[in-house]
């Protein structure tokens, strides 16, 4: 990412959770440990189905004495409805934000510069009621700012940032192996651990029970993780959703997200991933190759 560019993410939704049972309520649902927010002020987390299938992912932030969930705008209502369904007798209030917010991504270099200028030691801080934080998934994904929409132009000017096309950020995330848009195509189609939650700091098996915990623990603790969500790059033809990927006579994957940044659920054993990761593969009627991120061992 370019140092002085801000990638405006106008496709994000915001949900506030407040009430005396908020912490316990979220702890019983989310894949990550909500207690970490006391130290770090934020976490990356997910919600799974009772079977351990992927449903949603988001950042959770302690903001203005409430919990703020920042997620894809298209799924914000679904996430809010899901949480309200599980609320039962918990003393919590869950609602999409009525105030207008906007998120934007910035480079790690710029984030560290802002942090230093404001004499902050932590990777999360608030300036003028706007949130600044380092992406907890991967340091290479830089920093993020969640601001009141009315403050956007002022922040850009004050921080010497120039607004740029969000597609450049999505492309950067793709190259780092992290899907950023069209995540709804993953819903109920693969296990949460197959989405690399443990590697991207979105899963804590030591926290205790959460929705989908039983199957998730079984897969991880018994070393039964056999597939991972990985980026794929077109060589020729057109990649289509649900296309089967083949290596020699073996089915080694299936396309989950086709456009604009393609991701597939890929076998990592039987055959071993290293045998075909840099090989031209058949994908439906197209040819592709798998892009293995550095953080995948």
Segments the model singles out, each with a brief description of its role:
Residues 5-9, 14-16, 59-176, 247, ...:
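Acidic, low-complexity central loop/insert segments
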Residues 16-22, 35-36, 106-112, 233-240:
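Short, surface-exposed ligand-recognition loops at beta-strand->loop->(often short) alpha-helix junctions
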Residues 10-12, 42, 53-55, 140, ...:
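Short beta-strand-initiation
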Residues 40-41, 118-125, 238-243, 276-278:
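Glycine-centered loop/turn motifs
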Residues 1-57, 61-64:
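Acidic, proline/glycine-enriched N-terminal capping motif
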Residues 143-231:
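Anionic-ligand-binding alpha/beta catalytic cores of soluble enzymes and soluble regulatory domains
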Residues 54, 195-203, 213, 217-297:
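Glycine-rich, small/acidic residue-mixed loop/short-helix segments
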Residues 18, 72, 107, 148, ...:
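Solvent-exposed residues in well-ordered beta-strands and their adjoining turns
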């Amino acid at each position: 990412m370019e140092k002085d560019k801000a990638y405006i993410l106008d496709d994000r939704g915001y949900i506030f959770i407040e009430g005396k049972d908020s912490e316990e309520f979220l702890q019983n649902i989310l894949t990550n440990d909500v207690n970490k927010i006391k130290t770090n002020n934020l976490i990356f987390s997910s919600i799974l189905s009772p079977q351990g299938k992927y449903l949603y992912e988001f950042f959770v932030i302690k903001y203005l004495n409430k919990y703020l969930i920042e997620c894809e705008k298209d799924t914000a209502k679904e996430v809010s409805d899901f949480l309200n369904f599980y609320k039962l007798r918990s003393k919590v209030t869950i609602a999409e934000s009525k105030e207008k917010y906007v998120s934007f991504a910035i480079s790690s270099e710029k984030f560290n510069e802002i942090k230093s200028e404001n004499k902050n030691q932590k990777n999360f801080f608030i300036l003028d009621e706007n949130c600044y934080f380092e992406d907890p998934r991967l340091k290479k994904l830089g920093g993020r700012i969640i601001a009141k929409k009315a403050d956007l132009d002022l922040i850009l000017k004050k921080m010497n940032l120039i607004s740029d096309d969000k597609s450049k950020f999505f492309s950067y995330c793709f190259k780092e192996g992290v899907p950023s848009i069209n995540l709804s195509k993953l819903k109920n189609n693969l296990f949460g651990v197959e989405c690399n939650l443990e590697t991207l700091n979105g899963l804590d098996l030591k926290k205790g029970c959460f929705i989908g915990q039983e199957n998730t623990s079984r897969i991880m603790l018994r070393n039964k993780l056999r597939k991972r969500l990985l980026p794929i790059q077109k060589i020729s033809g057109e990649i289509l959703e649900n296309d089967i990927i083949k290596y020699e006579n073996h089915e080694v994957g299936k396309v989950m997200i086709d456009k604009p940044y393609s991701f597939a659920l890929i076998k990592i054993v039987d055959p071993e991933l290293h045998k075909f990761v840099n090989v031209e593969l058949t994908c439906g009627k197209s040819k592709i190759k798998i892009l293995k991120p550095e953080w995948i061992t």
